[in-house]
């Protein structure tokens, strides 16, 4: 038998088959979700600090003791990774000042013994100093320059409002000027009165002096009389004999009185001459 001829497929059917084949070749892209492992333990440095707080020894704690205590407290930590994590944590603690080596320790790196550093008390003054150190001096200068400008603007704006105050100030100045004038006039009057009183006192003194001089002038005349009396002294000395005569007369009277009878007064009293 002769071979059968291939039957030509319809054109529409070929297109559908081609579309099915193309769809099978398309790859479906699935989103790859990455699973993030959440750490069930705190960071290594905080774990080291916890261990050192519990074990406060003077000589400090060794690295091996720290590692064993971390594993006992946090069993989820991978012991293989903990070696490398401890080294980095200890170095960071030394750099930040959280950890300290004991005295007389010659160890270096993440070996030897470690202790916790004493917490430094930050005072208010220290905080203020830190704040002042962080501030830029240039910024302060700019703020100081800007502040006077604002003040000048405020003054210029307030000048029209201050006209009343200026008028009041002028009146006060005028009053203050008048008061000194009044005071000066009073002082001048007092000075004039004092001068008048001084002049009057001087005039009175002059009058008193003149009166004294007048009193002294006639007093000199009696001196002349005394001189005349002295000159006449010789004449009086010559007239002494009449005085003796007067004495003789008195003696005679006394003798006559003794010889005369005594007169009797009233009531038997004797009357004496």
Curated annotation (Swiss-Prot):
UniProt record, GO biological process: nucleosome assembly
Coiled coil segments of this chain: none
Ranges for domain H15: 40-118
GO molecular function: DNA binding
Location within or outside the cell: Nucleus; Chromosome
Gene Ontology cellular component list: nucleosome; nucleus
Ranges occupied by Sequence repeats: 189-198, 199-208, 209-217
PROSITE patterns documented for this protein: H15
First-listed, main subcellular location of the protein, grouped into a coarse class: nucleus
Biased composition (Basic and acidic residues): 154-256
SUPFAM superfamilies documented for this protein: Winged helix' DNA-binding domain
Bias (Basic residues) ranges: 264-273
Organism superkingdom: Eukaryota
Matching Gene3D superfamilies: Winged helix-like DNA-binding domain superfamily/Winged helix DNA-binding domain
UniProt-annotated stretches for the region Disordered: 1-24, 120-273
Region 3 X 10 AA tandem repeats, annotated ranges: 189-217
Listed InterPro entries: Histone_H1/H5_H15, WH-like_DNA-bd_sf, WH_DNA-bd_sf
Keywords: Chromosome, Developmental protein, DNA-binding, Nucleus, Repeat
Pfam family, one: Linker_histone
Family: Belongs to the histone H1/H5 family.
Subunit structure comment from the entry: Interacts with nap1l1.
UniProt protein name: Protein B4
Organism name: Xenopus laevis
